[in-house]
Design a protein with these regions (language model features):
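Short, charge/polar-rich alpha-helical segments
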Residues: 111-121
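C-terminal-of-GTPase-core extension/linker across diverse P-loop GTPases
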Residues: 1-17, 21-22, 131-352
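Short, conserved loop/turn and helix-capping segments at secondary-structure boundaries
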Residues: 104-107, 119, 206-210
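Charged face of amphipathic alpha-helices used as oligomerization/assembly stalks or helix-helix interfaces
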Residues: 125-126, 153
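Conserved G1/Walker A P-loop phosphate-binding module
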Residues: 1-102, 107, 125, 132
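Conserved phosphate-donor/acceptor-positioning beta-strand/loop module used by diverse small-molecule
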Residues: 86-93, 116, 191-196, 225
Length: 352
């Protein structure tokens, strides 16, 4: 799962990326494991020789652009389409050492981004509608082409009215045709207010953040505040010193795990596991089936799917391992349409 960090120059976007990656990433891309104590316990219990946690690929490789020249946003927005989720980093601190391009106003900056997403999606749809119209003129269109044109026309009307495409239901027979467009206004998004250290400790409150929260509420966007420089400095300390630093700054806990949880929730994800010498955690959209889980592991497992054995991680841990859970009758044999639950261990029976 790819998560793109969006933000103006000097918003703190790269500082946040450095905090997430520990400053060890190259080229603005970092695969960062998702904390999962349940999986860690399963891997220990199984005596795994190789342990692979689920991870998000965080990206801070989008080109900067000049906020005074919106046309320069075209390339970064085009690259953002390739991501699964967006994290919009907004500057909510002032500093003479990092002069900003305008007075500090995160609500204004968020509205700018939201408008750019709408305009960018409009351009994508207009280009596609133009190609479909030419196809119609040659009388070579299919029924699917006509259905796509009708749906895109409705989407165009919504975007022209300033609405996002988040609420649009795309028929299953058109999903594959539209997936490559990567509509920005349909992507899960988390808003991050990058505050100064003076607002650390307790719940950050200011008139500026209240205005930002109002915009987020109107657009049904989750918002959190953090201080990217503080998170980066905390991450660079030895673990033995981090608790003391948090206490000294009056901060209950690091903010980064909360950011990861928010992105996880916005992507509507759940985890499942394969355990043994090679133990792995996998990500699956909620509502995914046993067949979807098999396909996530390897296409051959889905192609030759016969049945799957599943058992919740808690029951495996309580029983003392997979074989013990089998003996205790906790393991279920399920078909391809079985709806996976968060935290299940799976073994796929297949034949190719």
């Amino acid at each position: 799962m790819k998560v793109a960090l969006m933000g103006f120059p000097l918003s703190g976007r790269t500082t946040l990326f450095d905090a997430l990656s520990g400053g060890h990433a190259r080229d603005g891309i970092a695969s960062i494991p998702i904390p999962d104590p349940r999986f860690e316990a399963l891997a220990r219990q199984a005596g795994a020789k190789k342990i692979t946690p689920a991870a998000f690929e965080w990206r801070d490789d989008l080109p900067d652009f000049n906020p005074d020249k919106p046309e320069t946003a075209r390339q970064p927005l085009s690259l953002a389409r390739q991501s699964d989720a967006l994290v919009c980093v907004l500057r909510a601190f002032d500093s003479p050492y990092a002069p900003y391009h305008a007075p500090i106003d995160p609500a204004r900056d968020l509205r700018f981004w939201l408008d750019e997403y709408v305009l960018s999606d409009l351009q994508v749809i207009e280009n596609r509608l133009e190609r479909l119209t030419k196809l119609f003129q040659s009388h070579k269109e299919s029924a699917a082409d006509r259905a796509e044109h009708a749906l895109l026309s409705r989407m165009h009307a919504a975007l022209s009215a300033g609405e996002s495409l988040a609420a649009f239901e795309i028929p299953s027979d058109l999903e594959a045709r539209l997936r490559g467009f990567g509509f920005l206004t349909r992507k899960p998004m988390v808003v991050v207010a990058n505050i100064g250290e003076s607002l650390l400790g307790g719940e950050a409150r200011s008139e500026m953040l209240a205005s930002l929260q109002a915009v987020c509420t109107a657009h049904r966007l989750p918002m959190m505040s953090l201080c990217a420089t503080f998170e980066r400095d905390l991450r660079q300390l030895p673990e033995s010193e981090q608790a003391e630093f948090l206490q000294m700054m009056g901060v209950a806990e690091p903010a980064l795990p909360r950011l990861v949880r928010l992105v996880y929730e916005q992507l509507n994800l759940q985890a499942f596991y394969t355990i043994g010498d090679d133990s792995r955690a996998w990500l699956l959209r909620r509502g995914g089936t046993a067949l979807d889980a098999a396909a996530t592991i390897h296409s051959d497992l889905a192609r030759g799917f016969i049945r799957a054995e599943v058992c919740h991680a808690d029951e495996v841990l309580t029983a003392g391992g997979w074989k013990a859970a089998q003996k205790a009758g906790k393991v279920q044999l399920v078909g391809k349409d079985y709806l996976m639950r968060d935290g299940e261990v799976i073994y796929v029976r297949f034949n190719v």
